[in-house]
Amino acid sequence: MVTGPEKPGIGFPSVLDSAYKDYKRHMKVSDIMSRGVFTTTADTPMAKAVRIMGERHIGSLIVMKFMSPLAIVTERDVLSKVLAGGLDLETTLVEDVMSYPLIKICPTLEIREAARTMIHKKGRLAVFECGELTGVITASDLIREMPDAPETSLGVDEFMTKEVVSVSEDEPVATVAGIMGKKRIGSVIVERDGKPAGIFTERDLLSKFLVFEKSLDTPVGKAASSPLKTAAAGISIHEAAKIMAAQHVRRLPLMKKKQIYGIITARDLVEAYAR
């Protein structure tokens, strides 16, 4: 049977799409890691470490000792170990609260394996090549490049946190920071007249208050990010990752019947992807 010539372009987009999806699924750590590594030293006061993180809008610093990478200190350490622990930022040293040892990975590792390491070891990852520190990997780095694949097609509802902590916009930031530190959570929903109006995060605490030594007696409503960015409950892990990356957020409240149904974080998405 004689057939005519194929029409140009038929199947070509799908081949490209398939190849791109396959490339995304097998990306390496070196493709997505943050190469600008900020450091501090073990004997640095936490007040100075906080200023660096706040000014740079970053969530962690690699801790150096004797010119070698030793550990990591994070914005969560500021909340849960310093503020919630009643410690003083000026007198507390980085080595008093840092996480040790440093979790090290290779730049040639595929990103899903990096996600599994992050969840298993419970922390940010330091990338080493030939013994040299070359970058860091955070949950935000991973969700920015999360592939559209079977493992990311699951619904977010299974992985979200249903118990969402809310506070009134009139609560002082000091009180809110105490709640976040004791509960070991990175954000609270801020309500106005009993309705969700914004979100206050550990990054807000660092970059808007601690770095400027601003009074924590300020009502949290004045510092919350508003309007609240949300998504519908039931979306896929991949869809949630795309929204977070596009909106430059790490926490996404999920709505159902015009009510907050839960909240999903970048780390939750990484945990789902790592399965």
Residue locations for each model-derived region?
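Tandem CBS (Cystathionine beta-synthase) repeat/Bateman regulatory domains
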Residues: 1-275
